[in-house]
Amino acid sequence: MQSSKKVCVVGAGHWGGNHIRTLYELGSLGGIVDNNKQTLSDFKTKYPSISLFQTVSDAIKLGKYSGYVVATPAETHYKIALEIMNSGCHVLVEKPVTLNRKEVSHMKQTAEIVKVNFMAGHVLLFHPAIQKIKEMIDTNVIGNLQYIYSNRLNLGTVRMEENVFWSLAPHDISVFQYFTKSKPMKITSTGGAFLQDNIHDTTLTILEYEQNIKGHIFVSWLHPFKEHRLIVMGSKGMISFEDSIENKPLKLYSKGYTLKDAIPTKKDGPVDLIDYENSMPLTEELKYFIQHMDGSPLEIANADNAVEVVDILIKASESLMKGVPIE
């Protein structure tokens, strides 16, 4: 995919580096912004034809980029994204998009006023297995959606500026919103802070939606092994996706319980391995962003999705600190 429209990446750290590499492979990398001179020097060696900048303002002044990816620390996203959008450029902002409701709402409003796309970096929505599950839900393969649970666990990177829920759960929240197409009516969260005061290392969050749909998200960066597991339960069957296992199996279980004469009766059935496309989520996300740099509306990971996810993060955090459900 070679595009005449170029993207500039703001923030060349670990995840920003992934964006840079992927955009270069797509033929769409135009520039890199980072305030670290050594980092820029390293990228100049790798990509000698790419323009380098120490400030976003300098990149904008050049006027050659149709879109920007913002992969800086979350607390800087708001200011950077506003500057980009107000220059008339489209922007993809990594998760968490912002750390408060007012900022993300203003970002959405700004995008609408200046008529640019504001996309959230909810990369899991572009995983082919997640899109396959969505297709199976929408085509009634598992019947009425009833319950979703997600475990995202590992002995991972411990943050000092945000808790584990803000760091890891945006992925899962975005998927829950994608599957349910509704906002949770009630959110209850609990967890433990063991390494730093008031920065939780593990959380369990319950989300209650309309039509008696329930879900839970369990995240931790203090876990002995990596586990990324998603279970989706319906009235006719269940789906499991093991993202942390080699070959990443997606399985359909045609079994469960039905009511027979008002008595729960177990229904056995086959377990089928479901095929899905072999594509990289980040590549698909960036291709989608580039395709929509013409200003056409985003159907996935759009501004509405960004606002919903941040709102759920905030309400879950409130429940976590107060020890009560939040409606």
PLM region spans:
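Contiguous beta-strand/loop segments that form the cofactor/metal-binding neighborhood of enzyme cores
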Residues: 1, 170-249, 276-297
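Predominantly a Rossmann-like dinucleotide-binding segment in NAD(P)-dependent oxidoreductases
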Residues: 117, 124-196, 323
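A short helix->loop->beta-strand "cap" motif at the edges of active sites that frequently abuts
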Residues: 29, 50, 87-89, 114-116, ...
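C-terminal helix-rich "cap/oligomerization" subdomain common to oxidoreductases
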Residues: 1, 67-72, 210, 288-327
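Short, conserved SAM-binding/catalytic segment
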Residues: 42-50, 107-111
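N-terminal Rossmann-like dinucleotide-binding module
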Residues: 1-47, 281, 290
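Short acidic low-complexity segments
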Residues: 51-63
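Beta-strand-loop-alpha-helix segment that lines the small-molecule cofactor/substrate pocket
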Residues: 62, 67, 73-74, 78-125
